[in-house]
Amino acid sequence: MAEKKKGGRWGIAHIYSSYNNTIITITDITGAEIIARVSGGMIVKADRDEGNPYTAMQAALRAAAIAKEKGIDGVHIKVRAPGGNKHTTPGPGAQAAIRALARAGLKIGRIEDVTPIPHDGTRPPGGKRGRRV
C-alpha cells in the first residue's frame, strides 16, 4: 500500500543581521519553540568576521541542517535589522543567509522585514547638531 505524502512541517527563520553579527534562529510556526539557534560568533574566532556574508552563509547552513534533522521542510523568513534609532537596513549577512537556507534544501515561503521602526522614540545619538566629522 502506497504511503500518502504529507505537506511537510514549516517553521520560521528569524534572521537578525547587523554590521557586527548575524543571528539565525529557527522556530516552529508559532514562534514559541526554538528548533535551532546559530550566530556568527559560533562559526568564526575573530570578532571582526562575525558580520561577514561568508559567516552568515555558514551559520545558515548549520541552522538548516539542525532544522532538517528535526523534521522542518520549509521556512518563512523574518529579516530584522537593529532598528529603533540605529540602522534600519539589514547588515551584509542577511542576503547570504537567505540564499544559503534556500540552497540547503529548505523550501522558502514568505520573506518579510520585521525591523522595529520608532514612532517618535528616543533622540538619535549625536546630539542636536549631529555627528561632526
Curated annotation (Swiss-Prot):
Q: Residue ranges of region Disordered?
A: 114-133
Q: Which Gene3D superfamilies match?
A: Ribosomal protein S11 (3.30.420.80)
Q: Which domain of life is it from?
A: Archaea
A Gene Ontology molecular function term of the record: rRNA binding
Question: Does the keyword field hold RNA-binding?
Answer: yes
UniProt GO BP: translation
Sorted alphabetically, the keyword list is: Ribonucleoprotein, Ribosomal protein, RNA-binding, rRNA-binding
In terms of InterPro entries, this protein maps to: Ribosomal_uS11, Ribosomal_uS11_archaeal, Ribosomal_uS11_CS, Ribosomal_uS11_sf
* Quaternary state and interactors: Part of the 30S ribosomal subunit.
The record's comment on protein family reads: Belongs to the universal ribosomal protein uS11 family.
Under PANTHER family, the record lists:
40S RIBOSOMAL PROTEIN S14/30S RIBOSOMAL PROTEIN S11
NCBIfam families linked: arch_S11P, PRK09607.1
Q: What functional role does this protein have?
A: Located on the platform of the 30S subunit.
HAMAP family, per database record: Ribosomal_uS11
| Protein name (database record) | Small ribosomal subunit protein uS11
Q: Which organism is it from?
A: Archaeoglobus fulgidus (strain ATCC 49558 / DSM 4304 / JCM 9628 / NBRC 100126 / VC-16)
